Each structure stands twice: as C-alpha cells, then as structure tokens.
Amino acid sequence: MPTPHTQQAYDPEGNFTMRWTRADIRQIVAQSHTAGADKNSLPQALTMPDIPQDFPLINSNVWVWDTWPLADLRANQLSYKGWEVIFSLTADPHAGYTFDDRHVHARIGFFYRRAGIPASQRPANGGWTWGGHLFPDGASARVFGTAPMTNNAEWSGSARLTNGSNVSLYYTATSFNRSAPGGADITPPQAIITRADGHIHADDKHVWFSGFDDHKALLQPDGNYYQTGQQNTYFSFRDPFVFTDPAHPGKTYMVFEGNTGGQRGARTCTEADLGYAPNDPYKEDLNAVMNSGAVYQKANVGLAVATNPQLTEWKFLPPILSANCVDDQTERPQIYLKDGKYYLFTISHRTTMAAGVDGPDGVYGFVGNGIRSDFQPLNGGSGLVLGNPTDFSAPAGAPYSQDPNQNPREFQSYSHYVMPGGLVESFIDAIGPRRGGTLAPTVKVGINGTSTAVDRTYGRGGLGGYGDIPANLPATGAGHNDGNSQ
C-alpha cells in the first residue's frame, strides 16, 4: 500500500520535503495488468493514445523537443498581437550528429502562428512558422567565463512576458568539456540556471525578438540540497519554471529539477524513503534496496525564491519533493493550480527508475494544499498520470535500440507539459524504427481531486492536433509582472 500523505501545506521557506517513496511508486505495477496482444500493462485511463507512425514534421530543417509557451507568471498562455508563440529546444538534423547526440548541441528557438484558429482548420503539422534561434550566437556561453568547454548548450526553462513587450527567458545554460564528441568528460559538465531578457515584436506578417544579449547566472547547485557535477558527473540541475503563488502575494518562486546533494552512490536512503507501513507484506529491506544499486537514483524537485523585485537575485529553499532510492530524474517540474489545489507535475523515464520499481516514460503528478506540501501522489498513490503504452514484462530497450518484445510506442512521446484546461503537449521521440524530433499531438487529461484520466473523446480517439499549444489569454500590456493578465 502507498505511503499516507496528508496534502498539508507548509511554509514555502520551511524545511518539509515530501518523499515520493518506493511504496508509492510500486503502486504503478500493482495497479497495472499483464500485457496482452496490445503490449500495454497500463490502465487505459493513464495511457497516452497511440500516435500514428506517419506523423508530420513541424519543420524538416529543425529537430524539436522540450517546448514551452509564452506565458505570464501564473502560467496563462498568452497570444501577442494575434500570434501564439512557443519556445523549443532545437538542433540541426543536417549537421552530421545523430538525434541522440542532439542534447549537447541544443539551442532555444521559437515558432509562431496565428491565434484563435481551431486545430481542425490548421495544417496537419500545427501550422507553426520557424522564427530562428532566440539568443545571439555565443551569448549563453558567456555565463561560464573562462571555464574550459568543448560545447555550450541551451536547455529548458520558461518564458514570462512582463511589462508589455519584455520577455524574461529563464533557462539552463550548460557546458561540456570532453575529450572528443561523445567522449569522456575532462571536467564535469556545468549547469547554471540563467535569465536573459529581450523584447517581442510583431506585425501582421510575422513575430521577431530583439535583445537577449546579456545572460545573468541565477543559481548553481550548492552540494547540500542540490547535487553538483563534482559530486556526480550525471547530476541533474535544470528546467526552471518561474511562477507566483496567490497565497503568497509579492513573492516569486521557481521549481526546477535537481538531485539530492551528496556523493554519487552514498548509502543515505532511509526507511522513510521506502515508506512502508510496518505490517506491509510487500515491505522491502533497506540494506537490500541500497545493495541493489538504488542509491544511484536520487532525484528531487527544487524550490527557490526571488529576493529582489527585479527577479535577478534568488536563494535556494529545501526541495519540495525527493525520490531517494526511487528515481533519478524528475524533469521539467511545474506547479499547476486547479480548484484551490496545487498540483506538481513532472516527467520521468522508465530507464531512470531505481532497481525494483517500474513505471513508463511520461507524466507524474502530486497534489497538495500549497507549493510546499505533503503532496499526495495521484491515481491511487502511484503518481502516474500519463504514460506511453509499455509492457512491464519486457525490457525497456532504448529509443535507438528498441526491444522486439516491447510496445513499439514505449518511447512515442516525452517532455510533456500540462497546459490550462488539462491539455498536454509533448514531442515525438520514436515510434518503432522512426525517430521524431517534432511535436506530438496534444491530448487532454481530466483532473479531478486525486485522480486523472485521459479524455478519449478529445480530438480523434484522444489525439488533438499536432503541436496544438493554444493561448488561453491575450497579452494586454500592463500587469504581467505580477501575473495578472486580465
């Protein structure tokens, strides 16, 4: 049975961290079934609908993956002068590296399309026009000063429209210093949560940006709450999502992906991380769990608060969620308010989960009464919200080397982002042998208290338009600095 969680809210600047436990995550398999001919173990209500293998490309000259909208500080998605605008991690499919090597070459780019057109009336690929790279060449690399590097990449974050036309882009500046492309690290990779500001412009024909020349380093891992590259070459520190909380007016917060501070593989997992009741017949032995290698999986969701009104100075707070001996990646976290509740959504991979637990690539979610809560994992305590169809009896494989016994859509979508109204966008990774690098069809998830379900009446069989990322409010000038875009 899952660990009891109360949803109780705590002071955001307090030190309570909700533990996503092994007892919680093991509910995924407990609530699943033996896969039949469909090669899917998951309940249908939690399964991403099958994406056709003949999917269209958003743009044949750009690989696209993590994507986020132009938004305000309350995550309303804004149209600007009649245009919808999105930002994506992009790479060049013609540059000679493979799709799986794209991460060290990632640049943030943008796309735009006219607002207010139903998906059914748009081109099959969503109708987005490629606007180009957002930042001037080399601007991101300057935050690293004289540190040696062979590659600089721009990783995910969030875009906030403030004060009319100002766009603050919070993102992850990364650098790599390797002996050869794909080779060994000479020095550990670096990741710095960074902000750059520019201005959006639009006329009746297109959208463009100016600025983004100056990049300000905001946060680097401290080694205490959040693991550093010196502690673990495989550390995670990325994906800033910046927001305001109506319960704490005047404050601006950021959630991000981290790992628990300390040396990689340290035997620091506790009985509380396992989370079993004393009489649970499925209770595991702590030493056996740590001996299994689960000590290498220690994800967390971090929290920071701005300490000045300009949002250029930030301080770490303790993480709001830990997944010690459970999972190693809780990517692209976001806070989502609905019906007075605070939902924490994040994404993860089957291959980053600890030995002895299992779950699909997809979205995981938790609900509480504040941004720091004893979050209750959704859907029977497991946390699973939306997973790719997966056969738990077959090995995971990899997007570039799929197991023949596995569901061919195990890697069909990833990097999901939950939008207003329960819409969820993502990108296509691999469907059978065909690789993606383009936006997936949007789906809709009904969110009701502690449970969610895919709406299969949405679109066609549950699949909406490819890359359908609609604005829910127009940008109306003043007010974006506090998120009140009314």
Language model features: what each stretch is:
Residues 1-486:
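Carbohydrate-active catalytic/glycan-binding domains of CAZyme proteins
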